[in-house]
Amino acid sequence: MSDYIVVKCGGSMLNQLNAVFFDCIKKLQQKYKVVIIHGGGPEIDAKLKDCNINVEKRDGLRVTPKEVMDVVQMVLCGSTNKKLVMNLQKHNLLAVGCSGCDGNLLQVQPVSEEIGYVGEVSYVETALLKGLINMGYIPVIAPIGVNGNEIYNINADNAAAGIAAALGAKELIFITDVDGILHEGNLVKETDESEIATFIETGVITGGMIPKVQAALASLKMGVQKISIVNGTKDFTEVTGECIGTTVTKGVSIA
């Protein structure tokens, strides 16, 4: 079993992280090698508004022409990344912030010309991550990548799944503001892609949880073996280092 854990923290969660979250990262780091990937959607939207640039999304992906890509890069690689790095270090967790273009860490395949500079992970330079971890640092990755000489925006879920799959990670943890999937008010501790399809069809999973489980299912298809959906505002780690939340595994494939 791999000793890597990949943690994905969406942009909407970054301002909600408290001391409990950083304590959980400490506990994980005692047993595993931790990599963190973050988003930055709300900050990007705010900066685009300041610049009088239209915000447009298609099928959950940000339409990213050149002028939008410049803002995305500035926000993700600048203030958002460094704020998270500084918060980690404030809690005595040594971290190094970098983006997917540093050292060609995340190489991408463009999604389509219609949505501009948006790519999906095609290759991860894992040696860079392993080197930072072996020196005692937590890599904190901004989800942009490269294709040739061009820089591309990457959906943070796709970046996290690509990194987790490339590292053969034990687990990919999605940090959210809910405890996991709830069924009749009770936490669903374990589920698989077949049961999730049923949950969506019967209305057990609704609203904001749908994109979270869709991201988990996409991660399974990329080769990640185990995904946990946890509440980042609460203690989400057991004494054993296992996560408290909903664990999603592949189970029986959907026909």
UniProtKB/Swiss-Prot annotation:
**Substrates-to-products reaction catalysed:** N-acetyl-L-glutamate + ATP = N-acetyl-L-glutamyl 5-phosphate + ADP
In which residues is substrate bound? Answer: G40, G41, R62, N153
**What Gene3D superfamilies does this protein map onto?**
Acetylglutamate kinase-like
A Pfam family reported for this protein in Swiss-Prot or TrEMBL: AA_kinase
Q: Which domain of life is it from?
A: Bacteria
* Keywords for this protein: Amino-acid biosynthesis, Arginine biosynthesis, ATP-binding, Cytoplasm, Kinase, Nucleotide-binding, Transferase
Q: Which CDD domains does the record match to this protein?
A: AAK_NAGK-like
Per the record, the GO terms for biological process are: arginine biosynthetic process via ornithine; L-arginine biosynthetic process
GO CC term (a single one): cytoplasm
Q: What is its EC number?
A: 2.7.2.8
- What SUPFAM superfamilies does the annotation carry? Carbamate kinase-like
Could you list the residue ranges forming a coiled coil in this record? none
Q: Site annotation (Transition state stabilizer): which residues? A: K8, K212
Where does this protein act, in terms of pathway? Amino-acid biosynthesis; L-arginine biosynthesis; N(2)-acetyl-L-ornithine from L-glutamate: step 2/4
Q: What is the annotated localization of this protein?
A: Cytoplasm
**For this protein, what is any one GO molecular function term?**
ATP binding
Q: Which family does it belong to?
A: Belongs to the acetylglutamate kinase family. ArgB subfamily.
What function does the entry list? Catalyzes the ATP-dependent phosphorylation of N-acetyl-L-glutamate.
Q: What is this protein called?
A: Acetylglutamate kinase
